[in-house]
From Swiss-Prot:
Protein's UniProt keywords contain Translocase: no
Motif Nuclear localization signal 1 (NLS1) boundaries: 124-139
Binding sites annotated in the UniProt record for Mn(2+) 2: 80, 108
Co-factor: note: Binds 2 manganese ions per subunit.
Function: Plays an essential role in viral RNA transcription and replication by forming the heterotrimeric polymerase complex together with PB1 and PB2 subunits. The complex transcribes viral mRNAs by using a unique mechanism called cap-snatching. It consists in the hijacking and cleavage of host capped pre-mRNAs. These short capped RNAs are then used as primers for viral mRNAs. The PB2 subunit is responsible for the binding of the 5' cap of cellular pre-mRNAs which are subsequently cleaved after 10-13 nucleotides by the PA subunit that carries the endonuclease activity.
Positions bound to Mn(2+) 1: 41, 108, 119-120
Name used for this protein in its record: Polymerase acidic protein
Description of how the protein assembles with itself and partners: Influenza RNA polymerase is composed of three subunits: PB1, PB2 and PA. Interacts (via C-terminus) with PB1 (via N-terminus).
Family statement drawn from the similarity comment of this UniProt entry: Belongs to the influenza viruses PA family.
Length: 716
């Protein structure tokens, strides 16, 4: 490319371009595409101004070879190609003599006929995109913009093209020739792809006063002034050679770029320790529902009425007893709390009119379970700032936990279909704009695939619980309100159904800040015997509360019914996000849409119908130790939805960190798979950043183990 530039452009232009690059600390030998771009831009500016004059009468004329004695003045002042100081001097002098507003950025030309500055753009991309970038950058009504492309297109402010047709045609022809010359030498593709968008840093953004002093104090070593540092930074090209740039920056940095090969990456190290435990705000696969079909009782839709009605469908209650104690808690209190719920529900029955809400008596067991009076007393800072040994509580490091198999089972269950529909067809709200036919069709297909999915049940359950808890937290701040955990669905036959999963009792909730915590006790029905995976239920006290008759293929069997009780907490901001869990539907729909778009652009027609209706085709779902798992399009929809839902249910700082850091490694591995020969430095540091997020969170540990499966198969 460098040779081509020296052959193709006038030596004066080449020299100016080299000077401009050196002024910014760039090397024409390394950044050859930029070198070519600067030469092209200079040449267009000169051609723009060539042969255009203003005669004695002030008229604009074109003179290609005229009388050297004629009194002609150049129509355009060329600003581009001068060194910065000189260029600003010219601009200032024009502004002083003509009264034109001074531009923020150095323009390329000044037009003495139209009395305006002109910004010339030459782009390898779409003219209108580049035009908008330029306009956005200079933000000035007064500077006229004129953009040319290598394909013969042009765009100018208010479609005012300044020059006559023929002059512009000369420029377009020259650009087209440059393009063809490059293409014949195999240079065009790299040149076309190397164009970056306009920088939108204000060139003359003045910093004064304290900020200026702070800026001067915080310069890196070896820089005398902010301007000096700025000029240096402006000269940075991201595709320059990195090692050189880094060693220039500081004597201490010596980054060696190591090639990233198939043998380079190692698997992520998952922590050792006891197996991780369940930490979701409500039970997932282990939940049990007491349900009523076609509810039509008095007060239907009032949660407490619905709950009592559901409780009455079950006849196998028995004297509760503890089958799996909570290691650290006072277990009899959990037992007493459940007995209190049963007793107070019984009391409601005996009243003439059932109330709409129920506040529990503040018994000692509930006060203990809800942490009443447990918070350390808040003291005003003024009263204790003189205490000599004032210090923050020591908090223990979290204990590392190992991956347990239950979380993969939870995820598999979330992807399965249930026999009920949890959302109506229009649940994934309409777009704001009138939705086009295709988008509506996609949404309907997608809804059909996920409406019966267990992950969708979790969404509706989460939305209900969080909404009810946030409402109660605001409406009954001091009360221990009893909140039924309810969901609604439709059976296969389309009959409405109301389900009760259990109850929540909320603690005091004076929530001033988004992060202030409200404690609650959850009590949830289940048929899962906690003794099968005791490690999963570390945070729970589990009672046996009844026997349920189940109809199976071999007839009726009786199974013990358990109640999973635990103390938990949440905050306003967490409840707000919980209420918005329906967004998971939208997120996974968008992921599916991008798959359809990719397929459609290959086939050059909309593939929505084929995508959903071709049942024989399988799609990659994820990686497992067995290899890449594949499944039907419906399975893909449900898997993406389940991932999104679990990201919400198991949201945590560990997940945030893991997602952000592992993505970097993922991109490097993908670059390797695409034969892009990626290089890295400090790969060890990246592994450290990823692995410091692998502590004890079940969902993060599962994602890390999936990531390891991906690494294994990606690098085979």
């Amino acid at each position: 490319m460098e040779d081509f530039v020296r052959q193709c452009f006038n030596p004066m232009i080449v020299e100016l371009a080299e000077k401009a690059m050196k002024e910014y600390g760039e090397d024409p030998k390394i950044e050859t595409n930029k070198f070519a771009a600067i030469c092209t831009h200079l040449e267009v500016c000169f051609m723009y101004s060539d042969f255009h004059f203003i005669d004695e009468r002030g008229e604009s004329i074109i003179v290609e070879s005229g009388d050297p004695n004629a009194l002609l003045k150049h129509r355009f002042e060329i600003i581009e190609g001068r060194d910065r100081t000189m260029a600003w001097t010219v601009v200032n002098s024009i502004c002083n003599t003509t009264g034109v507003e001074k531009p923020k950025f150095l323009p390329d030309l000044y037009d003495y006929k139209e009395n305006r500055f002109i910004e010339i753009g030459v782009t390898r991309r779409e003219v209108h995109i580049y035009y908008l970038e330029k306009a956005n950058k200079i933000k000035s009504e007064k500077t006229h913009i004129h953009i040319f492309s290598f394909t013969g297109e042009e765009m100018a402010t208010k479609a005012d093209y300044t020059l006559d047709e023929e002059s512009r045609a000369r420029i377009k022809t020259r650009l087209f020739t440059i393009r063809q010359e490059m293409a014949s030498r195999g240079l065009w593709d790299s040149f076309r792809q190397s164009e970056r968008g306009e920088e939108t840093i204000e060139e003359r953004f003045e910093i004064t006063g304290t900020m200026r002093r702070l800026a001067d104090q915080s310069l890196p070593p070896n820089f005398s002034s902010l301007e000096n540092f700025r000029a240096y930074v402006d000269g940075f090209e991201p595709n320059g050679c990195i090692e050189g740039k880094l060693s220039q920056m500081s004597k201490e940095v010596n980054a060696r770029i190591e090639p990233f090969l198939k043998t380079t990456p190692r698997p992520l190290r998952l922590p050792d320790g006891p197996p991780c435990c369940q930490r979701s705000k409500f039970l997932l696969m282990d939940a049990l529902k007491l349900s009523i079909e076609d509810p039509s009782h008095e007060g239907e839709g009032i949660p407490l009425y619905d709950a009592i009605k559901c409780m009455k469908t079950f006849f196998g209650w028995k004297e509760p007893n503890i089958v799996k104690p909570h290691e650290k808690g006072i277990n009899p209190n959990y037992l007493l709390a459940w007995k209190q719920v049963l007793a107070e529900l019984q009391d409601i029955e005996n009243e003439e009119k059932i109330p709409k809400t129920k506040n529990m008596k503040k018994t000692s067991q509930l006060k203990w379970a809800l942490g009443e009076n447990m918070a350390p007393e808040k003291v005003d800072f003024e009263d204790c700032k003189d205490v000599s040994d004032l210090k923050q509580y020591d908090s223990d490091e979290p204990e590392p936990r190992s991956l347990a198999s239950w979380i993969q089972s939870e995820f598999n269950k979330a992807c399965e279909l249930t026999d009920s529909s949890w959302i109506e067809l229009d649940e994934i709200g309409e777009d704001v704009a009138p939705i086009e036919h295709i988008a509506g069709m996609r949404r309907n297909y997608f809804t059909a695939e996920v409406s019966h999915c267990r992950a969708t049940e979790y969404i509706m359950k989460g939305v209900y619980i969080n909404t009810a808890l946030l409402n109660a937290s605001c409406a009954a701040m001091d009360d221990f309100q009893l909140i039924p955990m309810i969901s609604k669905c439709r059976t296969k036959e389309g009959r409405r159904k109301t389900n009760l999963y259990g109850f929540i009792i909320k603690g005091r909730s004076h929530l001033r800040n988004d992060t202030d915590v409200v404690n609650f006790v959850s009590m949830e029905f289940s048929l899962t015997d906690p003794r099968l995976e005791p490690h999963k239920w570390e945070k729970y006290c589990v009672l046996e509360i009844g026997d349920m008759i189940l109809r199976t293929a071999i007839g009726q069997v009786s199974r013990p019914m358990f109640l999973y009780v635990r103390t938990n907490g949440t905050s306003k901001i967490k409840m707000k996000w919980g209420m918005e869990m329906r967004r998971c539907l939208l997120q996974s729909l968008q992921q599916i849409e991008s798959m359809i778009e990719a397929e459609s652009s290959v086939k050059e027609k909309d593939m929505t119908k084929e995508f959903f209706e071709n049942k024989s085709e399988t799609w990659p779902i994820g990686e497992s130790p067995k290899g890449v798992e594949e499944g039907s399009i419906g399975k893909v929809c449900r898997t993406l939805l389940a991932k999104s839902v679990f990201n919400s249910l198991y949201a945590s700082p560990q997940l945030e960190g893991f997602s952000a850091e592992s993505r970097k490694l993922l991109l490097i591995v993908q670059a390797l798979r695409d034969n892009l020969e990626p290089g890295t430095f400090d790969l060890g540091g990246l592994y450290e950043a990823i692995e410091e997020c692998l502590i004890n969170d079940p969902w993060v540990l599962l994602n890390a183990s999936w990531f390891n499966s991906f690494l294994t198969h990606a690098l085979k």
